[in-house]
Amino acid sequence: MLKTLLGDPNKRKLKKYQPDVVEINLLEPEMQALSDQELQSKTGEFKRQLEQGKSLDELLPEAFAVVREASRRVLGLRHFDVQLLGGMILHDGQIAEMKTGEGKTLVSTLPAYLNALTGKGVQIITVNDYLARRDAEWMGQVHRFLGLSVGLIQQSMPPQERQKNYACDITYATNSEIGFDYLRDNMATSMAEVVLRPFHYCVIDEVDSVLIDEARTPLIISGQVERPTEKYLRATAIADALQKEEHYEVDEKARNILLTDEGFIEAEKLLGVKDLFDSQDPWAHYIFNAVKAKELFIKDVNYIIRGGEIVIVDEFTGRVMPGRRWSDGLHQAIEAKEGLDIQNESQTLATITYQNLFLLYPKLAGMTGTAKTEEAEFEKIYKLEVTVVPTNRATGRRDLPDVVYKNEMAKWRAVAAECAEFHQAGRPVLVGTTSVEKSEVLSQLLNQAGIPHNLLNAKPENVERESEIVAQAGRKGAVTIATNMAGRGTDIILGGNADYMARLKVREYFMPRIVMPESDDPLAMMRIMMGDGNASGGQGFAPQGNRPQKTWKASPNIFPTKLSRETEQLLKAAVDFAVKQYGERSIPELQAEDIVAIASEKAPTEDPVVQRLREAYNQIRSEYETFTHQEHDEVVQFGGLHVIGTERHESRRVDNQLRGRAGRQGDPGSTRFFLSLEDNLLRIFGGDRVAGLMNAFRVEEDMPIESRILTGSLENAQRKVETYYYDIRKQVFEYDDVMNNQRRAIYAERRRVLEGEDLKERVLEYAERTMDDIVEAYVNPDLPPEEWDLNSMVGKVKEFVNLLADLEPQQLEDLSMAEMQMFLHEQVRIAYDRKEAEIDQLQPGLMRQAERFFILQQIDTLWREHLQAMDALRESVGLRGYGQQDPLVEYKSEGYELFLDMMTAIRRNVVYSLFQFQPQYQPPEEMPSEVV
């Protein structure tokens, strides 16, 4: 009703941008008439106009017109009008919802270029290393052509490389790299170690994945803490002995377990202890984790075992996350369950959530195919508006009604039958599954039916071929099984992706001859040591010993035809020429990937190696296109890509992402969900209603049920889950917000010290406040002065400031409280000047170094302890909800007290340490524990 009266708010927003679109289109002929050099000189011109006081908004039409023309020349891609709209929405600091295949990656070049003109840096965030590298190589060419520098951050880069790349005008990186660099920068001991520049503007690709799906997971940098291994092993044995329902209850919804009274008694009996919570010998934590590991963490669903280690599988993307570990001893409990070596537990040194990390940017924007369902959350937490960008062509996708089966096996048989039917008809099929385990069940069924298919899940042998598999998922009769949204960012083109195939063919010949052995490549060695599991786009691995040896050979059935002799000769000659120029196996892998990327595009180049490779690439592509174009037309006639969902996800948004794979850019396509009454979503959130329905439907197993009530139940369950998780995220955000204010304060203080701003004044301020604290502790203004304990007070002052050994209580006798404080301020300043002269006599400037060292040391040590105290506080206030107190209010007030105590302790410890400091390394005296 309101929409009819007021008009669609989204349309109103888009209308606002229309005049700029018209102006950019009018500028197009003028831009096309410019030479390359004239087009490139526009960048300097824009920068000068900004210096003269012009705003970015005033420059927007011409700057966008320049980028559009540069992209046409360099990449052969011209921005559609809807892509210009997307660019304006991003420049305004909003979220642009653009459907799959509408060229989101190209859209980001517009606001990135415009905002980079300020010289303050722009960061483009993608969800994995492979996409960051692909976009930096591909879209980076437009920016480089226009004279801007482009940086790329990869998982294994050393700090100097990171610094150099962050200093570029535009930097491509993943969300986790930015997050961990931010935390590491705030643990640096000198400015030379800091890699990030101040945050300015950031565009997040797949913004829903980063700001919503991953918002619940904090980023944590931790240090090792030794804990007794046998405790984990005994706890696992006890968990195995305890019975579900009788000894403990499982809350799948909250992913938690609760021991019953019988459970506590049984565990204490088996362990031979009186109390699981005994502070001298605590067991509760170990037992809870062991039961969680037994009931809630399933092999091949939540984790896989690789190389004798537990590797986490990301529940949202289905990708493995090497190097990440669950905290609080949970990872160790799972290692014990699986009989693997138990590694040390970790202690948090620094932590932040993505929510608070990205709120540090003064200007933030994002793009995704699916944001509208979470619009309220984006606006509430991030103050980000969502604007839907219309598609360039109307979609040709049909969403067919869900079919529901009584049990899971019947559902899988039906999915396999549908795959077989479409495969026979020549239509490509993409099946989305929710776990590694499920994808393998379906794969077995298809093998039994003799249907060739590609499997894409978190297993290491599949990850490396990820984009190769996705790029060919649109071939005639292709059947592809993918876990969740693996392969996000690679388009499924009907009939196959000729550009991608040609690039693979060039890599296959070029890489083995040109890439230096891993032992000579420091980046590659770092990746091996850190266990890089990111889809690097490196195809084809042949096993050799423990470490697979790279071969770069793509599977032969990828290519639609063998190359003609002339084309193969051309490719070999180009590779020989490259080897002659660079030397055999002489350049690092990332650099070689860059050469292939540039050769596969249209950017003007003076490099003879790239020119020769490009000539070969173009010829290979045109040979492949003869086949793929023909196949494209056939597949379109058959009805396009058919997408099958095999379970409703916890969020409707993830379902929509899967559906969005079909019918890109106006192609035909269809989607259907196959469900069973045993699916997690229905089981956990659909509750008893579904159980009742199961009994009501007295049907054969293989008969599908189509029912309005059931579909309603599903929608309801999804809404419930979305609300449930939104509440959790909101709670995480509210609690973390308390920590966030404290984190900002402590990191700001730390940065001032790192930059060496007025260190002496800072320490003197610490000393004066410590003197004030001592006076307040010993002097009660409500009592007559003769009752003040001046002896003890002077004793305490001397403990902190040993250079005031001559101070006598009589000197303070006739002073008021305020005068005492003033007197001690003077005394401590005199003492500090003496100390400084004494230290600087040994080595000039040593006192400043000592100040920096002690302040940083105290901040880091006490902040680490504070994080643990805040964690413990958060757990304990949770229980107060039962006592009619608001846990959040309690957490805020007590957390603030803890923070003030920490700041006081930092000040006192620094003052004490500096006055005790003896560079000849004499052992310092015992530190006084408290002012009183």
Swiss-Prot record:
This is Protein translocase subunit SecA. GO terms for cellular component: cell envelope Sec protein transport complex; cytosol; plasma membrane-derived thylakoid membrane. The keyword Protein transport applies. HAMAP family: SecA. Part of the Sec protein translocase complex. Interacts with the SecYEG preprotein conducting channel. Has a central role in coupling the hydrolysis of ATP to the transfer of proteins into and across the cell membrane, serving as an ATP-driven molecular motor driving the stepwise translocation of polypeptide chains across the membrane. Probably participates in protein translocation into and across both the cytoplasmic and thylakoid membranes in cyanobacterial cells. PANTHER family: CHLOROPLAST PROTEIN-TRANSPORTING ATPASE, SECA INNER MEMBRANE COMPONENT OF SEC PROTEIN SECRETION SYSTEM. GO terms for biological process: intracellular protein transmembrane transport; protein import; protein targeting; protein transport by the Sec complex. It is a peripheral membrane protein. It comes from Cyanothece sp. (strain PCC 7425 / ATCC 29141). Monomer and homodimer. Part of the essential Sec protein translocation apparatus which comprises SecA, SecYEG and auxiliary proteins SecDF. Other proteins may also be involved. The keyword Zinc does not apply. CDD domains: DEXDc_SecA (cd17928), SF2_C_secA (cd18803). It catalyses: ATP + H2O + cellular proteinSide 1 = ADP + phosphate + cellular proteinSide 2. ATP binds at residues 83, 101-105, 491. It comes from the Bacteria. One of its GO terms (molecular function) is protein-exporting ATPase activity. Belongs to the SecA family. InterPro entries: Helicase_ATP-bd, P-loop_NTPase, SecA, SecA_CS, SecA_DEAD, SecA_motor_DEAD, SecA_preprotein_X-link_dom, SecA_SF2_C. Disulfide bonds: none annotated. It is found in: Cell inner membrane; Cellular thylakoid membrane; Cytoplasm. Its EC number is 7.4.2.8.
